[in-house]
Amino acid sequence: MRKIGFFGLLSALLLTLTTSCTSSESKISELTIYSGRTEEYIAPYFAIWQRESGVKLNIRYGDSAELAAQILEEGKNSPADLFISQDAGSLGAVAEQGLLTPLPKDVAEGVPAKYIQGNREWVGLTARVRVFAYAPDRVKVLPTSFTDLSKPIYKDQVAIAPTNASFQAFLTAVISNKGLPFAEDWLRKVKANGAKIYPKNSAIVEAIDKGEVSIGLVNHYYVWEVAEALGRPINVKNGYFKANDLGNLINVSGVGILASSGKKAKAEDFINFLTSERIQSRFVSDIHEYSLLENISIPEDLPPLSDLGAPNIDLEVLKNTKKTQDLLIKVGLL
């Protein structure tokens, strides 16, 4: 009797523990997200998730590079369950230190492999193309390469945003592809050619519209964004360099799950939500970024990604931002 009673009690205890673990996973009521995407653009999708899933999202917004540095400092003690970044470089820096967990193959199934980190530690959400924005009535000779912007024809007319993560990602690609001496020489020439410095991409587009400058390096959606904010057409268009030019870099926003998270299953559900056709279509219509899903339409009035002549750059190299930042400091642009 005692023997039967012991095993009966043990079985009941194991069943209780198993049920408790399953129940605790299914009843997760909160996820903590570090978001390098600004609240203005990403919060509406967070609201949809919270309403439909019943799971509250605790969001910490900030610059992607700064949030990556915060995660590196916190290490395995980070309270974050997910890290959303506006660029691949910041995700790569965190993944390199083993702080992101590989995603199962049934997560983000529709995203092409080239937009997923090799070990599946992060996945792309949207594509963002580097372009030159310009005033069509003032720029009569369009540049064919980013290197042209140091030429006398563009003296005192070029704008850049050295503190911006997207500019730094582009410069990181230049360093990786052309070497540090080449990148330094180009930066010094652009600076000597009278390049104007702005804090962010939208400020560059606004400056072109106001006539302060005539051409600037930005991401593709800022012309649309500024026109939307002003509620009127602006005197700015997107331009593209020749095929395979590094100035046509395609970067991605993306997301990864912290290895230290105890809520991985629910975090995976959230990634599947962000990479679903419904939300990907909203990214296109709401914020004018390219979906990474092949069956989703492209943003209005923009060419397909396949027509842009983007350079063949492994997004993994974009994590090497320290050399880039050191170079910008060296030439006096940071």
List PLM regions with ranges:
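A bilobed periplasmic-binding-protein/Venus flytrap-type ligand-binding module shared by bacterial periplasmic
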Residues: 131-138, 250-263, 282
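Bacterial signal peptide processing site
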Residues: 22-24
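An extracytoplasmic/periplasmic, membrane-proximal ligand-sensing/linker region
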Residues: 289-334
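A ligand-binding cleft/hinge motif common to bilobed small-molecule-binding domains
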Residues: 89-93, 214-235
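Short, polar/charged alpha-helical segment
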Residues: 35-57
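Periplasmic-binding protein-like
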Residues: 156-161, 273-297
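C-terminal motif of bacterial Sec signal peptides marking the signal peptidase cleavage site
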Residues: 17-20
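Extracytoplasmic ligand-binding site segments that recognize negatively charged/polar headgroups
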Residues: 36-43, 62-66, 78-213, 246-249
